[in-house]
């Protein structure tokens, strides 16, 4: 693959089209790059350059004219402002300032720390400057690909014959039939050539976590804050069962969120565990809310165990594991720290099913509301977080991750891996593994925060627009019987005239989204202060005709 054709250079210079020495020099540099089939995006103002960067985040190098003229229409955006915004979103893309040697002394240290160098377009030759830009872009792109995906691409692009499974032999078998030819054309040759088997030693083994697969899993653990991460190609359904098969034995007592996924119920059956259910709240809309914190207190759990008809001798049955859904389908996420505090003395293992919240670690709005939070106390329970990467991040369907945060509950990798192998095919789909590897790369560093921030921005705009439309309809001359519109299940401060918060506050202040005990919007009683929060990204629409009382 020729990366250079896919990753353009962004040239921000207000003299690009001017009949000046600087303008002619800039055009010659651009021409040199284009003559070498290197695409260039041209921007004549700071604002246009910023928009070009935001709409083309895959640019491989950025050239900024230090003498860009700030314009009122651009909000007086300067070259220094551009370097700060770009560097905040991408800490590695090369940035060069187009300037003169004598002007360097006037460039602030803050700007110097954000750039990779200077270009003196009136002194060096155009060919040399273009080559310098191209080299910087190539160096940047050499680090773009994560380990497994890089290895997979290298193998596919090495034009090797397939002497192993799968039987379609790199897609060739599909070419022997009309339906197969259409299938081949639809999915493309690279997809089919990348459908490989464990017979390719260069790519390591998912079952043994070796080679570039193991390297990719270790990188994922680092990015997602885990002590160890396993790539699961059977979705979070398989990941949930792996956790249970590795930690629970027949007759063990387990605490189970009654609002759990079917795979957790399957795990109970498969392991022969004895479930004690934690009942979540439910409001009059029928929305399932959080398990009240009172349900997770040791004395309440002890009473539940005493009343369980399957437990003959409660004193001889310690609780092995607790499984909590975080977040719920409607976006209720817990203070995981409080849950761990309540369960600390009762269980060795806590399993957070985070199928719908794999992005929470990457934005401060969700601080303390995900399983892979930092913990320095080895006496804390061991925590598992199973995440559907394919649901909420950029991965292929069935691509999930199983994260482990080691505590006092033993996790022997060899034993754990036996449970892993029971539920993972010996012929895993390599494109799923590659997508998990790429999802990790996308969330690493500053990128993860900004990807989540974009989702938050869009969700908040949507929430506010839904309310604004309702207000416009109410203000119209329609008769009451012709009036209807959807409402959004959300805190009043989103749009209430007296308490409305600004978009930036809503993106940064978790307090705006808490299920406070003195508020009626959520419809749950007995909720502890700061215990549960509504994820802004999960929008629940209430249809006309259903009242808050369920009528």
Identify the residue ranges that each predicted region occupies.
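Non-catalytic signal-transmission and effector/linker regions of two-component phosphorelay proteins
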Residues: 1-32, 36
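Output/docking surface of receiver
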Residues: 15, 42-44, 74-75, 99-104, ...
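Conserved phosphotransfer microenvironments
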Residues: 21-27, 46, 58-90, 99-106
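Short hydrophobic/Thr-rich beta-strand motif most characteristic of the beta2 strand and flanking loop
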Residues: 31-45, 52
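Conserved PLP-enzyme active-site core in the AAT-like
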Residues: 43-46, 69, 219, 239-249, ...
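N-terminal "arm"/small-domain region of PLP-dependent enzymes with the aminotransferase-like
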Residues: 126-210
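Conserved N-terminal alpha-helix of the aminotransferase class I/II PLP-enzyme fold
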Residues: 190-238
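Conserved C-terminal alpha-helix-loop-beta "cap" of PLP-dependent enzymes
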Residues: 456-551
């Amino acid at each position: 693959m020729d990366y250079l054709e896919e990753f353009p250079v962004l040239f921000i210079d207000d003299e690009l089209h001017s009949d000046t020495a600087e303008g002619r020099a800039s055009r010659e540099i651009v021409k040199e790059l284009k003559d070498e089939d290197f695409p260039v995006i041209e921007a004549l103002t700071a604002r246009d350059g910023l928009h070009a960067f935001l709409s083309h985040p895959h640019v491989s190098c950025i050239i900024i004219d230090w003498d860009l003229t700030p314009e009122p229409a651009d909000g007086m955006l300067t070259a220094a402002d551009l370097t700060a915004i770009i560097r905040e979103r991408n800490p590695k893309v090369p940035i060069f300032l187009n300037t003169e040697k004598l002007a360097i002394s006037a460039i602030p240290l803050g700007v110097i720390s954000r750039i990779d160098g200077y270009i003196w377009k009136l002194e060096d030759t155009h060919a040399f400057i273009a080559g310098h830009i191209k080299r910087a872009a190539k160096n940047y792109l050499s680090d773009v690909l994560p380990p497994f995906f890089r290895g997979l691409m290298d193998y596919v692009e090495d034009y090797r014959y397939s002497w192993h499974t799968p039987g379609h032999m790199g897609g060739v078998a599909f070419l022997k039939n009309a339906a197969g030819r259409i299938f081949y054309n639809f999915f493309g040759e690279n997809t089919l050539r990348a459908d490989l088997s464990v017979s390719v030693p260069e790519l390591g083994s998912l079952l043994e976590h070796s080679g570039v697969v193991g390297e990719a899993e270790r990188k994922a653990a680092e990015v997602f804050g885990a002590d160890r991460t396993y790539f699961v190609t059977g979705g979070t359904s398989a990941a949930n069962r792996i956790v249970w098969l590795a930690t629970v034995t027949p007759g063990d007592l387990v605490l189970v969120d009654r609002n759990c996924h079917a795979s957790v119920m399957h795990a109970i059956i498969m392991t022969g565990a004895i479930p004690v259910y934690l009942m979540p709240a439910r409001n009059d809309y029928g929305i399932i809310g959080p398990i009240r914190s009172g349900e997770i207190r040791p004395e309440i759990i002890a009473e539940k165990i005493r009343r369980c008809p399957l437990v003959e001798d409660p004193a001889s049955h310690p609780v092995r594991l607790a499984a909590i859904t975080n977040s719920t389908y409607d976006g209720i996420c817990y203070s995981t720290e409080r849950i761990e505090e309540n369960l600390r003395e009762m269980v060795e293992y806590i399993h957070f099913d985070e199928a719908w919240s794999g992005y929470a670690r990457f934005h401060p709005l969700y601080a303390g509301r995900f399983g892979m939070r930092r913990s320095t106390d080895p006496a804390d329970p061991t925590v598992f977080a199973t995440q559907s990467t394919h649901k909420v991040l950029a991965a292929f369907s069935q691509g999930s991750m199983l994260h482990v945060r080691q505590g006092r509950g033993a996790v022997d990798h060899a034993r754990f891996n036996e449970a892993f192998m029971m539920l993972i095919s010996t012929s895993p789909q390599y494109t799923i593994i590659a997508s998990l590897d790429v999802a990790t790369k996308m969330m690493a560093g500053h990128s993860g925060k900004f990807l989540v921030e974009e989702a938050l921005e869009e969700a908040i705009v949507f929430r506010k627009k839904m309310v604004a439309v309702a207000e416009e309809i109410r203000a119209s001359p329609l008769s009451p019987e012709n009036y209807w519109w959807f409402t959004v299940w959300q805190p009043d401060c989103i749009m209430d005239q007296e308490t409305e918060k600004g978009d930036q506050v809503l993106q940064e202040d978790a307090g705006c989204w808490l299920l406070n005990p003195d508020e009626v919007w959520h419809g749950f009683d007995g909720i502890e202060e700061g215990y549960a929060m509504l994820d802004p990204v999960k929008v629940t629409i209430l249809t006309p005709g259903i009242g808050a009382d369920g009528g």
